[in-house]
Amino acid sequence: VGDVFGQRTGSVMAPGLGLAFGLTGDEYIETARNNGWLLCSDDVATPANTSATEDLQLRATLEPVRDLKIDLSATRTATKSRSVQFMYEGSPTTYSGSFTMTTISLRSALEGMGDANNGYNSPSFNEFCGKVNAFRDRVQAQYEGSSVQDANPVNAYGADVLIPAFLDTYTMGAGGSLDIFPVLTRLLPNWSIRYGGLAKMPWIRDHFKSVNLNHSYKSVYSVGSYASYSSWMEYMGDLGYVKAADGSLTPSSRYNISTVSINEAFSPLLGVDMTFNNNLTCKVEYRTTRVLNLSMTSVHINESQSKDWVIGMGYKISNFNLFGSGSGSSRKAAGGKGRNDDNKNNSSKTQTTSKKGINHDLNTRLDVSFRRQAAITRDIASGVSSASSGNSALKISLQADYTLSRMLTLTAYYDRQTNTPLLSSSGYPTTTQDFGVSLKFSLTR
């Protein structure tokens, strides 16, 4: 009998249909070792690696009233890897992975960062520092009754304490949990809201084709790449002890996590898109972003914020006669012509344009944006905050695109950006200008 699915069919199927169809678990490595399917030698140090990814994505669209559209989305992704040194006694195993989950961090979303006069004071950071000892006591209580004698107390600045306190302070739905990787029931949605009903109001309808209000919110909690402690000893579940170089034991979870972060963005917090009756488009937006990075290595919270004000305008001139070729835009001729004559001329122009199949459109765009960003380093041990970087930037962009033919597009642009640093020690004001003309040739049209 020939081989089927890579199996030896002379006696029993090996290495098994479960492996062929990807249905085996982590225990398969031990099975393969016991059956002699793996090369066990001190000269071969290549471990057996397994990985698993859990990716949950939820989306929903709501329309509670006419012209009001709400898009909800929630994601949770957990990646876990396992590396087994099966060639050594006891099969030493290393675990690693990463984790991301959408959440809501509105409690301090619009909170200011403070300034130099008040020491960059942050009420949320003060609340976080006040919770550290309470969470340390709760973690320490989990080790009561342990048979391990003379163990060190729980480290107040370890991941087991700081991460739960961090989530409880800056996110919603934590409920005082001690979980480093929040469970599925703590998954919270992000949203995008769009309302277009203003264009139906009498005065607005007379001047605008459309008016849309926009709002979007996104917040993601992330655990960077982590790995298990090589000297970790299990006590109960994910609780255990890490053996130090001097032989002492310190209560700790299995994983060595150096950083976690919360990335939050209002993009925009409030935005208005308008289209006038003459096809002039305008956009006004206010955006904010915030990144909170908790470092267990430096025992700091690095907080960075940016605020953007954006104004944009665009206008399209159809069939614009720039170089005196092609059918120009229609103009009203001097002299007395009847309505029938005008209709004949318009019909003739339409037919001419249709025959050529080319509209020499001129698209213009003007964007003005102002951004202020700053980064603050907050020391958890001392409670002191200091500015580390920041700047303000004003950018003006002007662009015009002209369609020469179905394959050629002429573009002219001008960009000007002025940067002013927040700290005089970090640099000096700079201004950059870019301008030019480009000709784009496309074969796909």
What is each of the regions a protein language model found here?
Residues 1-445:
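Exposed, low-structure sequence patches enriched in small/polar residues
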